């Protein structure tokens, strides 16, 4: 029975990649080294919109949509369903952890990051792509209101107060102009990668 369930989970995970409406941005890769249990729990809590301790297919689809990863509902239902225990309405945290481990490269591509940065400056291209997600108006800077808008889309509680968002900006704003330029963003992201690993 357990071997059959594992095979079903593997097949459903393999079906996810073609069900995505577009290829996931490399900027949103889940990197095993930097996504520990505490961070995964925070992601789970964000995706669990109604706070009932389970993530339904609808809640997961809404979260993926907010990240720009439109997924086919049928494929998503099959993948999630393979990890939902009998009698449960959705993924509990331990099921979500199992799904996260199973998805690995199937959904987000290779998780290996070459030590030289990927050759040809690919790391900078990924960083620029991530920066563009936050630089909503395309002016080359991330303002507090732009950051707040993205945080709202992601359902993050930090988005509730513009003063808190401004404080977040101040923490990385080296030239004190009240906004984050690409260099400041890059330093911040490299710090997250180093300290989060």
Swiss-Prot record:
Alphabetized GO MF terms: calcium ion binding
InterPro entries on file: EF-hand-dom_pair, EF_Hand_1_Ca_BS, EF_hand_dom, EF_hand_pair_protein_CML-like
Location of the region described as Disordered in the Swiss-Prot/TrEMBL record: 1-28
Classification via SUPFAM superfamilies: EF-hand
Keywords linked to the UniProt accession: Calcium, Metal-binding, Repeat
Residues reported to bind Ca(2+) 2: 135, 137, 139, 146
Biased composition (Low complexity): 1-11
Residues that, per the record, bind Ca(2+) 1: 48, 50, 52, 54, 59
PANTHER family per UniProt: EF-HAND CALCIUM-BINDING DOMAIN CONTAINING PROTEIN
Function description: Potential calcium sensor.
Identification of the protein by name: Probable calcium-binding protein CML24
Protein's organism: Oryza sativa subsp. japonica
Organism ancestry: Eukaryota, Viridiplantae, Streptophyta, Embryophyta, Tracheophyta
């Amino acid at each position: 029975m357990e071997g059959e369930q594992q095979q079903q989970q593997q097949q459903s995970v393999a079906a996810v990649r073609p069900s995505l409406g577009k290829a996931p941005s490399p900027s949103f890769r889940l990197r095993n080294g930097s996504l520990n249990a505490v961070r995964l729990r925070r992601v789970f809590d964000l995706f669990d919109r109604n706070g009932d301790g389970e993530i339904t297919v609808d809640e997961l689809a809404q979260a993926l949509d907010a990240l720009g990863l439109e997924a086919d509902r049928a494929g998503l239902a099959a993948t999630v369903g393979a990890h939902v225990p009998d009698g449960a309405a959705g993924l509990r945290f331990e099921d979500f952890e199992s799904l996260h481990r199973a998805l690995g490269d199937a959904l987000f591509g290779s998780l290996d990051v070459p030590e030289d940065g990927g050759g040809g400056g690919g790391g900078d291209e990924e960083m620029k792509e991530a920066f563009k997600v936050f630089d909503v108006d395309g002016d080359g800077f991330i303002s507090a209101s732009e950051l707040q808008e993205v945080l709202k889309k992601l359902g993050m509680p930090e988005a509730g107060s513009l003063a808190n968002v401004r404080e977040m900006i101040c923490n990385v704003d080296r030239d004190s102009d009240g906004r984050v330029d690409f260099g400041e963003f890059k330093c911040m992201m490299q710090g997250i990668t180093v300290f989060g690993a």
